[in-house]
């Protein structure tokens, strides 16, 4: 069966605070003197999936996101094929 590679980019929804991102943003601006206007953290998950075709592989990745990898209440995600 073919192997498909995906990256899932996850970050907080825009209406959810990102305390770690806010702290890093403040340190870069105030302590390091860098002109950082806005910083938000996220995570990237890389997955390799065996499936019959690309569409089935994408369905598997989407199911993994919805059931475990992403908290839809506070996070949003985007899937990219690698």
UniProtKB/Swiss-Prot annotation:
It is found in: Cytoplasm. It comes from the Bacteria. GO terms for cellular component: cytoplasm. It is an enzyme of class 6 (ligase). InterPro entries: PurS, PurS-like_sf. Its main location: cytoplasm. Its EC number is 6.3.5.3. GO terms for biological process: 'de novo' IMP biosynthetic process. Keywords: ATP-binding, Cytoplasm, Ligase, Nucleotide-binding, Purine biosynthesis. Belongs to the PurS family. Part of the phosphoribosylformylglycinamidine synthase complex involved in the purines biosynthetic pathway. Catalyzes the ATP-dependent conversion of formylglycinamide ribonucleotide (FGAR) and glutamine to yield formylglycinamidine ribonucleotide (FGAM) and glutamate. The FGAM synthase complex is composed of three subunits. PurQ produces an ammonia molecule by converting glutamine to glutamate. PurL transfers the ammonia molecule to FGAR to form FGAM in an ATP-dependent manner. This is Phosphoribosylformylglycinamidine synthase subunit PurS. It comes from Thermotoga maritima (strain ATCC 43589 / DSM 3109 / JCM 10099 / NBRC 100826 / MSB8). The gene is purS.
């Amino acid at each position: 069966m073919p192997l498909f590679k995906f990256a899932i980019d996850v970050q907080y929804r825009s209406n959810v605070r990102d305390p770690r991102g806010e702290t890093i943003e403040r340190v870069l601006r105030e302590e390091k003197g860098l002109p950082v206007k806005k910083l938000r953290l996220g995570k990237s998950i890389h997955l390799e999936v065996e499936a019959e075709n690309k569409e089935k592989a994408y369905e598997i990745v989407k199911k993994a996101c919805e059931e475990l990898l992403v908290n839809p209440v506070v996070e949003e995600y985007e899937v990219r094929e690698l």
